[in-house]
């Protein structure tokens, strides 16, 4: 679904000092991201600490961000779960709230078969009118969704695309070659954005775009318009920053970077911990080489 945008930011969830969700800051951050290159936002995905945000908090975040954003950008709700019934109920709630689409992660921990994955996503998609984006991230879920399963799911009309974070470029090429023409493939890894564009993907669901959204947008736009040398130069320039943002588990580095730059997003909920000094020093050093696109207010 091309209208969801080429550059989508997987937003962090801001917390107050007491650990509660800071909905006002989430709204402010959402608008800042749209002002710095993002076409849309994933709310309460991996970067938004979905495992430790309650359903009630999720729904309130969906509503708060959508209220702030309005028609300025697309709001994609992270509604996935490793229980099909819970994911279905969460998706239906997000639909009632009025989000633009949902992101459904491959079920984690319980290790379903490929047929189980197919039936999981099919069951949810057929129960909602929302556009559904699949999310393959085996580094976190253990289970890898095979290309054949994605291709099969792409025949369901409101399964509109996939966030592909496996890093398996051969599998991704197979997906792009065999899905229906309007099925959209986004990179789920910032470092894979340009290589995947070269293979025919559409864009990226990004973490680094919290900081350098305009530059990532320039890279994508340049590639699409045929200025591949400029796109490649941006990719090479951003690579050290991207590497520093994944030196430990996401969203630890990006939350540290935002707080360090003056964008108050608070800490993390256990079992995630804040960046240690070695990690923090590496991120601070990396940031010195970059212009930050996000408005700092």
Swiss-Prot record:
Presence of the UniProt keyword Amino-acid biosynthesis in the record: yes
GO MF annotation list: 4-hydroxy-tetrahydrodipicolinate synthase activity
EC number: 4.3.3.7
Site (Part of a proton relay during catalysis): 46, 109
Gene3D superfamilies for the chain: Aldolase class I
Annotated GO CC locations: cytosol
Catalytic activity from the UniProt record: L-aspartate 4-semialdehyde + pyruvate = (2S,4S)-4-hydroxy-2,3,4,5-tetrahydrodipicolinate + H2O + H(+)
Pathway field: Amino-acid biosynthesis; L-lysine biosynthesis via DAP pathway; (S)-tetrahydrodipicolinate from L-aspartate: step 3/4
Sequence positions that bind pyruvate: 47, 205
Spans traversing the lipid bilayer: none
SUPFAM superfamilies documented for this protein: Aldolase
Catalytic residues as annotated in Swiss-Prot or TrEMBL: 135, 163
InterPro entries (UniProt xref): Aldolase_TIM, DapA, DapA-like, Schiff_base-form_aldolases_AS, Schiff_base-form_aldolases_CS
Localization in the cell: Cytoplasm
Gene Ontology BP terms: diaminopimelate biosynthetic process; lysine biosynthetic process via diaminopimelate
Keywords of the record: Amino-acid biosynthesis, Cytoplasm, Diaminopimelate biosynthesis, Lyase, Lysine biosynthesis, Schiff base
Subunit structure, interactors included: Homotetramer; dimer of dimers.
PANTHER family given in the database record: 4-HYDROXY-2-OXOGLUTARATE ALDOLASE, MITOCHONDRIAL, DIHYDRODIPICOLINATE SYNTHASE
Function: Catalyzes the condensation of (S)-aspartate-beta-semialdehyde [(S)-ASA] and pyruvate to 4-hydroxy-tetrahydrodipicolinate (HTPA).
Family note: Belongs to the DapA family.
Protein name: 4-hydroxy-tetrahydrodipicolinate synthase
Taxonomic path: Bacteria, Bacillati, Chloroflexota, Dehalococcoidia, Dehalococcoidales
